[in-house]
Amino acid sequence: MYLLPLPAAARVALRRLGVRGLWDRGLSTADMTKGLVLGIYAKDKDDDLPQFTSAGESFNKLVSGKLREMLNISGPPLKAGKTRTFYGLHQDFPSVVVVGLGKRSAGVDDQENWHEGKENIRAAVAAGCRQVQDLELPSVEVDPCGDAQAAAEGAVLGLYEYDDLKQKKKVAVSAKLHGSGDLEAWEKGVLFASGQNLARHLMESPANEMTPTRFAEIIEKNLKSASSKTKVHIRPKSWIEEQEMGSFLSVAKGSEEPPVFLEIHYMGSPNATEAPLVFVGKGITFDSGGISIKASANMDLMRADMGGAATICSAIVSAAKLNLPINIIGLAPLCENMPSGKANKPGDVVRARNGKTIQVDNTDAEGRLILADALCYAHTFNPKVIINAATLTGAMDVALGSGATGVFTNSSWLWNKLFEASVETGDRVWRMPLFEHYTRQVIDCQLADVNNLGKYRSAGACTAAAFLREFVTHTKWAHLDIAGVMTNKDEIPYLRKGMSGRPTRTLIEFLLRFSKDSS
């Protein structure tokens, strides 16, 4: 145990407020390693007082109303997502952070397409936990704030930071549920957030560390520790050649790093022969653009061009931990896209697994080339659903930015399921057009059956989706273009700056709901 010195200014403030702190009383037995995050709602009416949550009200009574007294005279009412820290109120919690939750009545917002109350909890709890981390306290108890799952997600997502390769690291903070609330919901939230953090870790890691082989090994380790109902196949280049995945191989051949086709199985259904859901993820572990090389500015971000593979694999790991009663298969073609004497050249023609030929007019449109073969292979499992995720186009970022994942699908039923899941998680999706209008722009090709570029500069995300559709015959397929949500600057308050791991939680929620519908 160590003693955290109370800041001098805070000690003066406490004395002026008439609160004799633990430091004044000399209680050496106090637990100085633990913080507490409590929620308070905004006023519903102008003449109302802001109301504590149940946990907040209980703590206020425990300290004889001092928390309310200090809060009232320390500044204006807390707005949603804002925090205020108090010291020395109780020997078990030397630091108490009160967080603004917004209005208690906040629910699903049909314009924002999310549950505002849940989002407020995630943002507020994340801010409170970071305050505790800044105080270098290794433990924090968190008020469930009326939704223990959302609170857990805010805590675990908000505290995560990739510092694996730094000598100086932030204090690791262990977040626990405060009181005897809904522990099951809290643990579910921890699981959802941990799944997203796994994707963030994979995406943030530098490309010289996170090679195709290393990526596959990490997923294998995580999946096998999640459940015994799993199988992992790390397919080498020779297997890819046997499968005649010429489109995938054409991208991989430019790099000295060997390609890997990762195939993971979670067999949760009591019926071993039940048709699976198949998730497919783009796995470019570094994208230089190839011969059609990218500008050097921000090229380092292309270490996360395997975000599709990271999110779908992390979602399946989470589904295995949840022990969902369904069968799921994950497919991830993994390679680098590099320029060399062996690399694809503009104008080359390659052949996909289904026999279709592809004219490669731009080697930086490589994600669709590797997905084409993976989508063809996905059909061999006779799946119920095929969903692929990919950081596919800069055009998607231009269209939606970081507000939502773009979804292109041939199934309104599948769209509705994904949308409903996203409202729950706050990691939103938005339906994009899959018109024949765009298909004509990719099949009008001089040398081959299909071109990896659209005929015109405009609607790049739509023509990329139309290209993928040429390799899909399944009637329940969705393509998630996650290029716009790949990173977070300051848009999502409960995620730190860096790779976002989105939309992992939405995929987990989709799987959870699908499993309930199936049963």
Swiss-Prot record:
A Pfam short name: Peptidase_M17_N
Details of cofactor binding: Binds two metal ions per subunit. Two metal binding sites with different affinities are located in the enzyme active site and can be occupied in vitro by different metals: site 1 is occupied by Zn(2+), Mn(2+), Mg(2+) or Co(2+), while the tight binding site 2 can be occupied by only Zn(2+) or Co(2+). One Zn(2+) ion is tightly bound to site 2 and essential for enzyme activity in vivo, while site 1 can be occupied by different metals to give different enzymatic activities. Mn(2+) is required for Cys-Gly hydrolysis activity.
Keywords: Acetylation, Aminopeptidase, Cytoplasm, Hydrolase, Magnesium, Manganese, Metal-binding, Phosphoprotein, Protease, Zinc
Residues annotated as catalytic: 294, 368
Catalytic activity of the protein: Release of an N-terminal amino acid, Xaa-|-Yaa-, in which Xaa is preferably Leu, but may be other amino acids including Pro although not Arg or Lys, and Yaa may be Pro. Amino acid amides and methyl esters are also readily hydrolyzed, but rates on arylamides are exceedingly low; an S-substituted L-cysteinylglycine + H2O = an S-substituted L-cysteine + glycine; L-cysteinylglycine + H2O = L-cysteine + glycine; S-benzyl-L-cysteinylglycine + H2O = S-benzyl-L-cysteine + glycine
Binding site for substrate: 282, 287, 292, 294, 305, 364
Keyword hit for Aminoacyl-tRNA synthetase: no
Phosphoserine modified-residue sites: 54, 180, 194, 238
The protein, known as: Cytosol aminopeptidase
Organism this protein belongs to: Mus musculus
Highest classification ranks of the organism: Eukaryota, Metazoa, Chordata, Craniata, Vertebrata
Gene: Lap3
